[in-house]
């Protein structure tokens, strides 16, 4: 009986460790490793969700952003359909932008696609396409 309980506890512990390690924080990575990881995640996301927008016209542009600080009252007013619904004030995210080549094709938004990725979990949470369509990945 004790061994069965011990095995179950060990399994649960390993499950928590595996889940935690899969959500890698980009904060601790060196600059070049972080950028290559962001580009890889963005390409995988586009390949899965919008493969026709995985057009590489030069190197992707990476920019770092922070969710603005909100008062508790302002947080309650964020609509559920918002891309940033549930985000914490000050939470850091990256935008990986795939630039357009206007000599080949021109998009309304001025880029082919943008993938939004959280810094703390390395998870993509939104895609903005060059035709002005936004896809939430929640």
Located regions from the model:
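A short, surface-exposed interaction/processing loop segment used at functional sites
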Residues: 107-138
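Short, non-transmembrane alpha-helical segments in secretory-pathway proteins
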Residues: 25-82
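Exposed beta-strand-loop-beta-strand "reactive/processing" segments of non-cytosolic proteins
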Residues: 63-119
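Bacterial Sec-dependent N-terminal signal peptides
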Residues: 1-26
């Amino acid at each position: 009986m004790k061994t069965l309980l011990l095995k179950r506890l060990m399994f649960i512990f390993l499950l928590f460790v595996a889940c935690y390690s899969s959500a890698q924080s980009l904060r601790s990575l060196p600059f070049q490793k972080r950028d290559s990881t962001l580009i890889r995640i963005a390409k995988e996301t586009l390949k899965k969700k919008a493969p026709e927008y995985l057009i590489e016209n030069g190197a992707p542009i990476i920019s770092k952003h922070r969710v603005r600080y909100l008062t508790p009252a302002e947080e309650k007013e964020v609509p559920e359909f918002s891309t940033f619904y549930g985000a914490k004030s000050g939470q850091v995210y990256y935008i990986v932008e795939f630039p357009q080549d206007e000599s080949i094709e021109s998009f309304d938004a001025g880029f082919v696609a943008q993938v939004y990725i959280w810094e703390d979990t390395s998870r993509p949470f939104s895609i903005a396409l060059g035709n002005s369509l936004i896809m939430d990945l929640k």
